[in-house]
């Protein structure tokens, strides 16, 4: 995937940040947030707009991005008062990532390995991902780097995901760009392929949401 102009501008802003903890990311993130707001406006009011013809608009290919975007930039917490003022659910000190540590897996292959274990291989037979999107916490979990101990073996990874970190996790799939008739005809194939217990199927605007757990 070739980075869009907006994505490249975001990556350039990240790369230009000074090194060291406590760097304010607001000015870096705000232009991208403003652009997302504009894309949402176009989606609601002008769907024929040329910007929306690119299926990757608003996205960043994190696996093809430089290391700057994959590196932790820590906030500086002065004291307990500062912590309580800025965080609703503060992370314990021993769980906070250190400055300069990786904030995501190193490459796509590592993500795929984590995803296969997290989903217990339930999507391994889904060969055609056209109009199917996996999103939500399950994807973020597989993007997050694991400690050496937690990734020592497939058994260790499985134990971490399903016993320690995400014991009640689920996998969210979204179907897009399909008519109701196409969705109806696609579901039997998808449900046969995805060997999961389906918890919920619902429509969200122009997409269909299938939620299940392994």
Language-model features: locations:
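Catalytic cores of the polymerase beta-like nucleotidyltransferase superfamily
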Residues: 1-214
